């Protein structure tokens, strides 16, 4: 510890500046810092600031060749975390010139690249980032955004419905296409490739794209509604990914998909640019996010990954349900849902939002709800997330005792009933079950679904609390 203290003294002298006034062009970060025993919070916070901006572990003569005061990222405020021993929120301001324009990759490499393995810290978590308008404006953002998507699909005034095709792995391309067709003709808007469906021996990507598009056009002709299937173009190289997106565009389908964390921000931004230039919507899956965001005291909170996705580009992103089988604490989830959809979001610590964020008219992203949800969840989902969301039922469609199309009908009927009830001024939170029961009296498909899932609950406390 003596050695550590000797090294970190320098950091505190240079990088802890509580009188610093933040600039409108600064990128601001809130880190949850857990110092090692014996390391004061100011020193730990200053060490984080230094190591993620201009500092290194010792004084170097080349420091004299530049203006460190201009480029250093100071730690300007530290506060203890309520209810936690030896945890602090350290606020760091980064000058805009430290970052390449329009590169999420570079932003993350700087801010979280090195500092998380630091010896002086027991744990470190990036809780939030404030992206200044000057930096936001260097990004294209989502290829199209919420309003343009609704106009393309001609769907207004309700959440969109989706379904992941199951079993996720093992179907042949033709059987996969059959499942897509059954779901789409039953009344949903989208079907989805599972995130791990890329191009495996049992189903190569080109065959899947062809059969899924055939299913989509057949369902469109039958229902008179515009349909989509998220064709997952994620691949081993960026070039192969773009090749798949080009093929999707040639088929004339409306939307493709990407796994943005496993695929990487550079690939994702390339694909987002291609999608805007070629009129494709882009659905984003967050596979691998829990590796980064699940631990409360170490990693990166999902709200930061969500902001980065809005900058990199995507029209939909999976973002927790509040109900169902996957994590999500209500206020915190709604906080980052607003950060995805809205143009201006006020600081609100009760929802985990550490900074006011102004997106200066960057298009919004539709949050996607998926994971263990079924018809009984519909009133809660409609109430909590409103119209601008995609509700994705995988097992909640394909698990219907009568098959895919009736499962889809049940979900659409439940959704329309909830939207109508809400528009009539009814309280979905209180009357939800009754609304579903009433709709089930004239929809045998919904009635059967209500029987199957009436008792299912996923009762675990959320780990992500304030």
From Swiss-Prot:
The keyword Transmembrane does not apply. This is Ribulose bisphosphate carboxylase large chain. It is an enzyme of class 4 (lyase). Substrate binds at residues 114, 164, 168, 286, 318, 370. RuBisCO catalyzes two reactions: the carboxylation of D-ribulose 1,5-bisphosphate, the primary event in carbon dioxide fixation, as well as the oxidative fragmentation of the pentose substrate in the photorespiration process. Both reactions occur simultaneously and in competition at the same active site. It comes from Lobelia sp. The modification N6,N6,N6-trimethyllysine is found at residue 5. Keywords: Calvin cycle, Carbon dioxide fixation, Chloroplast, Lyase, Magnesium, Metal-binding, Methylation, Monooxygenase, Oxidoreductase, Photorespiration, Photosynthesis, Plastid. GO terms for molecular function: magnesium ion binding; monooxygenase activity; ribulose-bisphosphate carboxylase activity. One of its GO terms (biological process) is photorespiration. Belongs to the RuBisCO large chain family. Type I subfamily. It holds the Pfam family RuBisCO_large_N. It catalyses: 2 (2R)-3-phosphoglycerate + 2 H(+) = D-ribulose 1,5-bisphosphate + CO2 + H2O; D-ribulose 1,5-bisphosphate + O2 = 2-phosphoglycolate + (2R)-3-phosphoglycerate + 2 H(+). The modification N6-carboxylysine is found at residue 192. The record marks 325 as: Transition state stabilizer. The keyword Kinase does not apply. Its EC number is 4.1.1.39. CDD domains: RuBisCO_large_I. Binds 1 Mg(2+) ion per subunit. Its cofactor is Mg(2+). It is found in: Plastid, Chloroplast. Its main location: plastid. The basic functional RuBisCO is composed of a large chain homodimer in a 'head-to-tail' conformation. In form I RuBisCO this homodimer is arranged in a barrel-like tetramer with the small subunits forming a tetrameric 'cap' on each end of the 'barrel'. Mg(2+) binds at residues 192, 194-195. Heterohexadecamer of 8 large chains and 8 small chains.
């Amino acid at each position: 510890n003596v050695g550590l203290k000797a090294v970190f003294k320098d950091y505190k002298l240079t990088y802890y500046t509580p009188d610093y006034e933040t600039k409108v062009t600064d990128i601001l970060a809130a880190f949850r810092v857990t110092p090692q025993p014996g390391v004061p919070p100011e020193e730990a916070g200053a060490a984080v600031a230094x190591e993620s901006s201009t500092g290194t572990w010792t004084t170097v003569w080349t420091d004299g060749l530049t203006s460190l005061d201009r480029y250093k990222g100071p730690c300007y405020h530290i506060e203890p975390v309520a209810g936690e021993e030896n945890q602090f929120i350290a606020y760091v301001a980064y000058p805009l010139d430290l970052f390449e324009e329009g590169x999420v990759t570079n932003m993350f490499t700087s801010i979280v690249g090195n500092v998380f393995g630091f010896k002086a810290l027991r744990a470190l978590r990036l809780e939030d980032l404030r992206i200044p308008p000057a930096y936001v404006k260097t990004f294209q953002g989502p290829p199209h955004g919420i309003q343009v998507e609704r106009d393309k699909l001609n769907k207004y005034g309700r959440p969109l419905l989706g379904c992941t095709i199951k079993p996720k792995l093992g179907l042949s391309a033709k059987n996969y296409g059959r499942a897509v067709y059954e779901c789409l003709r039953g009344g949903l808007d989208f079907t989805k490739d599972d995130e791990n469906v890329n191009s495996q021996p049992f189903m190569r990507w080109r065959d899947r794209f062809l059969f899924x598009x055939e299913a989509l056009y057949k369902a469109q002709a039958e229902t008179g509604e515009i349909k989509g299937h998220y064709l997952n173009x994620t691949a081993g190289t960026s070039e192969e990914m773009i090749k798949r997106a080009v093929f999707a565009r040639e088929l004339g389908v409306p939307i493709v998909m990407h796994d943005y964390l496993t695929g990487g921000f550079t690939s994702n931004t390339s694909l987002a640019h291609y999608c805007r230039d070629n009129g494709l919507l882009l659905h984003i899956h967050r596979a691998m996010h829990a590796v980064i965001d699940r631990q409360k005291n170490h990693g990166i909170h999902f709200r930061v990954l969500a902001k980065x996705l809005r900058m990199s580009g995507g029209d939909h992103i999976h973002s927790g349900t509040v109900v169902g089988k996957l994590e999500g604490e209500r206020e915190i989830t709604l906080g980052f849902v607003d950060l995805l959809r809205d143009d201006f979001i006020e600081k609100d610590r009760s929802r985990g939002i550490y900074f006011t964020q102004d997106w200066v008219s960057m298009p919004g992203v539709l949050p996607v709800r998926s994971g263990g949800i079924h018809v009984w969840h519909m009133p809660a989902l409609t109430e909590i997330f409103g119209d601008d969301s995609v509700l994705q039922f995988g097992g909640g469609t394909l698990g219907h005792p009568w098959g895919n199309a009736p499962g889809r009908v049940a979900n659409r009927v439940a959704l329309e009933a909830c939207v109508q009830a809400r528009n009539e001024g009814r309280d979905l939170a209180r009357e939800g079950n009754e609304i579903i029961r009433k709709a089930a009296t004239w929809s045998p498909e919904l009635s059967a679904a209500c029987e199957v899932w009436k008792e299912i609950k996923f009762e675990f406390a959320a780990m992500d609390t304030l």
